[in-house]
């Protein structure tokens, strides 16, 4: 018995160490990849998720879900503020979905995301709801408690740098910070939009 314990315990310890190391390496790869796409630094909290995984988070999870794509200049500007606020508030993970492909192909998962966000999306000229980006959803126990998509459908001729002046940035970061704190606590805000 003692002999088998001497073998089993080191094996279990090695497996646990390998799993923990794998977790950090995997998360580090997401952060590096995200930094290459968005230039936010490698110490960012963004972890990649596919559309199916985002559907599951929206249905059952708790967290912050950011949807965008790196070719979008509004997304690049927005994500820097989201990243900064998330780090200030101790948010360890923000789930990221590059939604461009799913949206263009109108995949089953994209349609499900639209259905789960019904009433929290902008409309196309044809009157259909659509995920315009940048879009961030704040989810607690499978309930979207709030979202932000302020610059997802800007129609005027303005650049992100022109739009995001100091006051606009501060206002957004206060809103994001409040919602991140609620997600971190697992709370539901009933008057966040007031």
Locate predicted features.
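N-terminal targeting signals for export/organelle localization
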Residues: 1-45, 194
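Thiol-based oxidoreductase modules, predominantly thioredoxin-like and allied folds used
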Residues: 40-49, 67, 91-116
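Typically the conserved alpha-helix immediately C-terminal to a functionally engaged Cys/Sec
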Residues: 74-91
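The canonical Cys-X-X-Cys-His
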Residues: 72-75, 136
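Non-catalytic, surface beta->alpha helical segment in thiol-disulfide oxidoreductase systems
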Residues: 126-194
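Short active-site neighborhood of thiol/selenol oxidoreductases, capturing the structured segment around
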Residues: 58-72, 82
């Amino acid at each position: 018995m003692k002999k088998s314990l001497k073998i089993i315990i080191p094996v279990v310890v090695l497996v646990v160490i390998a799993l923990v190391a794998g977790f950090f390496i995997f998360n580090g790869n997401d952060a590096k990849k995200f930094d290459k796409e968005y230039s936010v630094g490698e110490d960012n909290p963004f972890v990649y998720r596919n559309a199916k995984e985002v559907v599951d988070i929206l249905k059952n999870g708790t967290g912050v879900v950011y949807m965008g794509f790196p070719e979008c200049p509004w997304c690049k500007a927005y994500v820097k503020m989201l990243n900064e606020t998330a780090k200030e508030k101790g948010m360890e993970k923000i789930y990221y979905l590059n939604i461009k492909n799913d949206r263009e192909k109108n995949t089953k998962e994209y349609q499900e995301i639209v259905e789960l966000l019904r009433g929290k999306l902008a409309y196309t000229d044809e009157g259909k709801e659509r995920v315009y980006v940048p879009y961030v959803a704040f989810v607690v126990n499978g309930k979207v408690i709030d979202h932000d998509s302020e610059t997802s459908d800007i129609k005027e001729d303005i650049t992100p740098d022109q739009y995001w002046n100091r006051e606009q940035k501060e206002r957004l970061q206060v809103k994001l910070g409040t919602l991140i704190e609620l997600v971190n606590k697992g709370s539901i805000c009933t008057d966040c939009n007031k």
